[in-house]
Swiss-Prot record:
Belongs to the universal ribosomal protein uL30 family. The keyword Zinc-finger does not apply. This is Large ribosomal subunit protein uL30. InterPro entries: Ribo_uL30_ferredoxin-like_sf, Ribosomal_uL30_bac-type, Ribosomal_uL30_ferredoxin-like. GO terms for biological process: translation. Part of the 50S ribosomal subunit. It comes from the Bacteria. SUPFAM superfamilies: Ribosomal protein L30p/L7e.
Length: 61
């Protein structure tokens, strides 16, 4: 059974964001607008996404 994956795309810059938001974007492997990463769908990833939900777009794969 394969694990579910999420494709996370950064749609807004972190300029003007808090230190926590900047650190979370970096932890997700993002860093610039329109950058995409695929991550495992787990509670830890969902929590990180919730912190920066206004900066990213999430799609299930």
């Amino acid at each position: 059974m394969s694990e579910k994956m999420l494709q996370v795309t950064q749609v807004r810059s972190v300029i003007g964001g808090t230190k926590k938001q900047k650190a979370t974007i970096k932890a997700l492997g993002l860093g610039r607008p329109n950058h995409k990463v695929q991550i495992k769908d787990n509670p830890c990833s969902r929590g990180q996404i919730r912190v920066v939900q206004h900066l990213v777009k999430v799609e299930e794969l």
